[in-house]
């Protein structure tokens, strides 16, 4: 496993985690907002 492939895998994992975190946070905000109303 070369350093380039490790960097590429790390970038892919990082992007997936960021997208998952944004979706999760948006879902929680939506649920909390619905309960508040």
UniProtKB/Swiss-Prot annotation:
Coiled coil: none annotated. The 4 large subunits of the cytochrome b6-f complex are cytochrome b6, subunit IV (17 kDa polypeptide, PetD), cytochrome f and the Rieske protein, while the 4 small subunits are PetG, PetL, PetM and PetN. The complex functions as a dimer. One of its GO terms (cellular component) is plasma membrane-derived thylakoid membrane. One of its GO terms (biological process) is photosynthesis. It is a single-pass membrane protein. This is Cytochrome b6-f complex subunit 7. GO terms for molecular function: electron transfer activity. It is found in: Cellular thylakoid membrane. InterPro entries: PetM_cyt_b6/f_cplx_su7. The keyword Transmembrane helix applies. It comes from the Bacteria. Component of the cytochrome b6-f complex, which mediates electron transfer between photosystem II (PSII) and photosystem I (PSI), cyclic electron flow around PSI, and state transitions. Keywords: Electron transport, Membrane, Photosynthesis, Thylakoid, Transmembrane, Transmembrane helix, Transport. Belongs to the PetM family. The keyword Transmembrane applies. The chain crosses the membrane at residues 11-29.
